[in-house]
Amino acid sequence: SASSLVKEAQERLKLNEDNLLFKEINGNLGELEAKNIFDAARKGDEFSKDLIEYESDYLALGIGNLLNIINPECIVISGGMSLAGDEILLPIKEKLKKYTMPPALENLEIKVGVLGNEAGIKGAVALFI
């Protein structure tokens, strides 16, 4: 999730300030958002790329477990992680091969949701309307 990505980044930034991400947020860890990490990664920041790679492994593991159990035809990445686009989709797709039985990957479609960071709250509101 975007919040776990931010928490991991905050912990790592306490130990390593020599990167573009730290400069982009002017050292203010409390202001860090997932979007900052994705933007820095797009600018070539290896620190941010490593964070995305780390998070994509956990997402692939979770998605792989779902695929192995219920085998859906489509997975939608939404919320704050959807802001990453291909930066998160490509590593997830690659890592799914490690965590998923091959038949579950045959007809799988992975998409990025269009609701962005507000997907969860909009879904919750829709349930009550």
Regions found by a protein language model. Give the residues of each.
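ATP-binding/phosphotransfer module of carbohydrate and carboxylate kinases, centering on a glycine-rich
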Residues: 1-129
